[in-house]
Structures are given as C-alpha cells and as structure tokens.
Design a protein with these regions (language model features):
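Mature catalytic core of soluble alpha/beta enzymes
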Residues: 2-246
Length: 246
C-alpha cells in the first residue's frame, strides 16, 4: 500500500481512503453532492454557506470531464483519438492539457507509468469481475504498441503515431479532476471543502474550526470499510493504491 500527499495522483487504481468521523465542524453544516463517473463514486463536500450552486457546477464539471476523458464511451474525445487509426484529432484544451501531463509523467517515470498502456491492460478485461488471463503471445503483441513517445501533440491536435496505440487516462484523470475542482472552488471563494474521487481525497483548507481532516486508510481486503490507520491533512491530498481492488 502507498500513501502519498500530492496534487495529481498517478495510480492505476485509486481507492481505500475515506473521511473518518469528526470531519465536519460544528458550524456551518456541510453540504455534499455525489455523482458516479469513471466507475467511481465521487463525493464533494463543502463547509461554506450558500454552496448549493457551486456544488451543482462541480457535478456538471465531473460529468463533462467523464464525457471527454472516458476511453470506453463512444463519442468521447479519448475514444475518438484511440479509434482514429493514427490520424490527427483536434481535442479540447483540457483534454490536451491532461494528455500532455500524462506524457510528461510517463517520461519522468521512464515508461514505468505510461498513458498508452490500454492495449495491454485491455487483455485482462479488468471490468469483468472474473477477469481474463491472456497468453504470452497476446501480451508481447500488446506491449509492442505501448510507448508514450508515440503521442504527438501540436497545439490542440493530438496524433498517435502507432495506429494500434491507445491512451488510457485512468491513472491520472482523477487527480487532475480533483485539482481542477479545487481550483474552481477557490475561484468561488470556498475555503473549506473535501473532494473524494474514489479514494483520491483532496482537502481545500481545513475544517471550519481550522483543525485537520482525519482521513482513514482502508485495511486491505476488509469488507466493512475498517481503517488500518489514518492521516490528518489540511490543504493536501491523500491517495492510496493496492492490489485488493480493481
């Protein structure tokens, strides 16, 4: 298990973190919105007054990002790019920005993290609860199409130089969205908020009484949400990853 404090969480699976009791201050009462995107339950909680419209806008942003960043939804920008047979595709600014960040982190990780992993990860069919174990021939073929170097960005145009390559932003999108939501909340003069994207937990400030949020780290394989430890944060992020969830 890894616990990190960072702005953009780079993990294939982000889960296992949650707010323990005592996260809310005595006043004002927190207001939350929940939406499911990227196969993840996203909860945004704001502790400032008059935040209903702001939360509605946050939900709309999540749905918009999902519509553009999903690689499995036909009509999304990433789906269009992955099915362009190597032809250049014009994308929105946010999508290009996220791809560029993904390429940069892939470079910094020397390919150990790579946003073009989709041809390989698809072989396991992780969305299927039973899973699939591919044979070595299929694995080697898929690996030949992985390489962030095959992503070419020119302005708002992105091209996959290998027609068989495919981008999967699942390892970086949630952290990126959390950062964007935090930036929006700050623009709206929100001072106290908690953003939970499937275990990628980001705090804006602290609680209304200026104390820390107490973020629980789920015990691996526990079925009842039992916490193995907790982390106190203020204006930081906590991201956990492990092998016990998809």
């Amino acid at each position: 298990m890894k616990i990190k404090s960072l702005g953009i969480g780079i993990c294939l699976s982000l889960f296992g973190t949650f707010c323990l009791g005592g996260c809310s201050g005595s006043s004002p009462q927190p207001v939350s919105r929940t939406v499911t995107v990227f196969d993840t339950v996203v909860t945004i909680t704001v502790y400032d007054k008059d935040s209903e419209d702001v939360l509605d806008a946050c939900v709309a942003k999540c749905e918009d990002y999902n519509a553009r960043f999903s690689r499995t939804s036909e009509g999304s920008e990433i789906y269009e790019l992955n099915h362009a047979n190597g032809e250049p595709v014009t994308l929105s600014g946010d999508t290009v920005d996220l791809i560029q960040k993904g390429v940069e982190y892939s470079r910094l990780a020397d390919g150990k993290f790579d946003i073009t992993i989709a041809p390989l990860s698809d072989l396991w069919d992780f969305k299927n609860n039973t899973g699939t174990v591919p044979d070595d021939t299929a694995i080697q073929e898929a690996k030949s199409h992985i390489g962030y170097e095959n992503v070419r960005v020119d302005g708002n145009t992105v091209q996959l130089l290998d027609p068989e390559a495919a981008i999967d932003l699942g390892g970086i999108a949630k952290g990126y969205i959390a950062d964007q939501l935090k930036a929006y909340l700050k623009e709206q003069n929100v001072s106290h908020a908690l953003i939970n994207l499937g275990g990628n937990v980001l705090a804006l400030g602290g609680k209304p009484d200026d104390s820390d949020y107490n973020i629980g780290i789920q015990k691996p394989f526990a079925q009842n949400g039992e916490a193995i430890t907790s982390v106190k944060i203020k204006d930081q992020s906590v991201v956990s990853s492990g092998i016990y969830e998809r």
